[in-house]
């Protein structure tokens, strides 16, 4: 990243649902090619993510989650969503961490992750967990370099295909 460029975060609002959905879909289209069916990635993923984020951001319980948008010089390039899961023994769910493909490797993922960590600490929680699609080697490598630990795998269904979701945890330092 050029030294004079500014990477910043801002809270997401309901008005950002379509924007978040477009980043989410673009990330999946680039990352999940070969892991999920092309017909899903090239077709319904855009509409599916738009409906998902519209519903999620308008649903009650917003105090249980943080959604932040990363911007580079005011241009949205990524987002993070973390949510308290009171019934979970695993802690706070880092549910989404996505950067547009052209902006990966410039520190946006780390910035978004730190925002989720800070929010988790402020909630009095000591651990985050996430699921990553088996075969998503770049994301797995990123999480492991950040100190996340693999703790298990679960069957799931995504994009019309049975998949394996790998669970990782990250214990926050005090």
For every predicted segment, state its role.
Residues 2-7, 11-14, 25-102, 110-119, ...:
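Acetyl-CoA-dependent GNAT
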Residues 13-16, 136:
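Acidic/polar helix N-cap motif
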Residues 19, 111-112, 138:
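Charged catalytic carboxylate motif
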Residues 20, 24:
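Hydrophobic pocket/interface hotspot
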Residues 92, 126-141, 145-174:
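C-terminal "cap" of GNAT-fold acetyltransferases
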Residues 100-102, 106, 134-135:
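Active-site acidic-Proline motif in GNAT/NAT acetyltransferases
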């Amino acid at each position: 990243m050029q030294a004079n460029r500014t990477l910043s975060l801002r809270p997401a609002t309901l008005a950002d649902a379509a924007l978040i959905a477009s980043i989410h879909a673009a990330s999946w289209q680039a990352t999940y090619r070969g892991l999920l069916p092309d017909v899903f990635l090239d077709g319904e993923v855009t509409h599916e993510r738009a409906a998902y984020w519209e519903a999620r951001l308008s649903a009650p319980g917003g105090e249980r989650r943080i959604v932040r948008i990363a911007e580079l010089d005011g241009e949205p390039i990524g987002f993070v969503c973390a949510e308290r899961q009171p019934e979970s023994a695993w802690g706070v769910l880092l549910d989404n961490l996505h950067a547009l493909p052209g902006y990966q490797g410039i520190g946006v993922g780390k910035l978004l992750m730190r925002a989720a960590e800070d929010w988790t600490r402020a909630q009095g929680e000591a651990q985050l967990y996430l699921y990553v699609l088996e075969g998503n080697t770049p994301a797995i490598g990123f999480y492991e370099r950040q100190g996340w630990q693999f703790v298990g795998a679960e069957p799931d269904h995504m994009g019309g295909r049975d998949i394996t979701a790998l669970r990782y945890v990250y214990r926050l330092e005090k």
